[in-house]
Amino acid sequence: MISKFSTVYAGHVDLPDMGQMATPANERRYSNDHLATVFSKTEAIARCMDEHGYSTLWLAEHHFQREGYECLPNILMLAVHLAHLTSRLRTGCGFNITPMWHPLRLAEDYAAADILTGGRTVFGVGRGYHTREVETFGAPMLDAEANRDLFEEQVDIIMKAFHSESFAHKGKHYTLPPAVPYRGYELKDLTLVPRPLRQPVECWQPVVSASARGLDFMIKHRIKGLIGGGAATMAEKSIFAYQDAAHRGGLDYKLGEGLSLGIFYHLAESRERAVREITPWYEEHVKMFGPLGFVPGITPSQLEASTKRGGWDAGGVPTLEHYARVGAWFAGPPEELVAYLKTLEQAYPGLEHVHLSNSMGTPQKVMLEQLAWLGKEVMPEFTRR
């Protein structure tokens, strides 16, 4: 049954204009002072979520985002800071883009965050999706297979480091430790100092393609999966595929177990008002994520139309109403959201986690109002039984 509510905040600053008639995504530029407001915005979101009993604030690691959409470069540093401002809320790494790190540096930094926050930092790994970020840090992104090979070896190393008193690794990309003399002996193994105190380390990863290779790798390391904002019907293939992988790995998972299902939402007194209020933010979401492949079902011609000011209807760009009808976005009153979530419980009896998130571009004031409203009128229907 659903019992844990979270949200995903990718780190957008408040934008002065939004929607299809507003500044095109690639033309947005902001001052350093304005980009830095992402931290005060994150603090406000964390305090609000902590007050209303949320489980986890998932933050996204991104770099070089002068457009103002994803402006948090280091989740682990921020997690330590947020732990001083909150009493219960966990900060989730959604996600540490592993190919941009040395695996042992990432393992060390997470271990420090785990200890300093008293276990309120949740580990998460991802392969990345921005060429500007991953390739700039010297890792492959355009070559998907090379990216996956590197990622899997890195995660293997991280898990060895987390869970072993000492370890060694020899692979395609890393030989750890190197064969060097050290204080009179030949180096044969390493120890992560200190290791995380919470063992085994809870780890999450996004489920995107839901390939058998990717899911089997997750199950091998007992990695849980976040399925991003999309209709349950769209996510159904991934949900069943994850359970199948768990069964192949010898785990008797119920359908939905080990997963968190994501939904974009906006509450209002009526569906019509909710749709009207969030349409500009939805359109900004399409402008940002469409070219990156995260707007399900959009065609190349529709994508081309979405890069221009206006004319989206003529170009056939999917509307918010379309995604609301299929359940990818929820727009309406709290009682209807409660009913929708209960249908998900019935369909996926192992589902405990959901992450309900505001659209890219949603102003801070609105995000705080929505999080509080959800916490008061939706979450108690699931957390107090």
Q: For the regions a protein language model found, what residue spans apply to each?
A:
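Alpha-helix-loop-beta-strand connector modules within alpha/beta enzyme cores
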Residues: 69-93, 150, 374-383
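A conserved active-site cap/scaffold subdomain adjacent to cofactor or substrate pockets
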Residues: 208-239, 243
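An alpha-helical appendage that flanks or caps ligand/catalytic pockets
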Residues: 3, 7-30, 145-192, 234-348, ...
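N-terminal beta1-alpha1-beta2 module of alpha/beta enzyme domains
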Residues: 1-85, 200-201
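Hydrophobic faces of well-ordered beta-strands that scaffold small-molecule active sites
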Residues: 5-9, 57-59, 90-93, 121-125, ...
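Acidic (Asp/Glu)-rich catalytic clusters
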Residues: 50-51, 79-88, 110, 114-121, ...
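Conserved, mostly hydrophobic/aromatic
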Residues: 53, 61, 82, 113, ...
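Internal, glycine-rich beta/alpha segment that forms the wall or movable "lid"
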Residues: 16, 102-221, 249
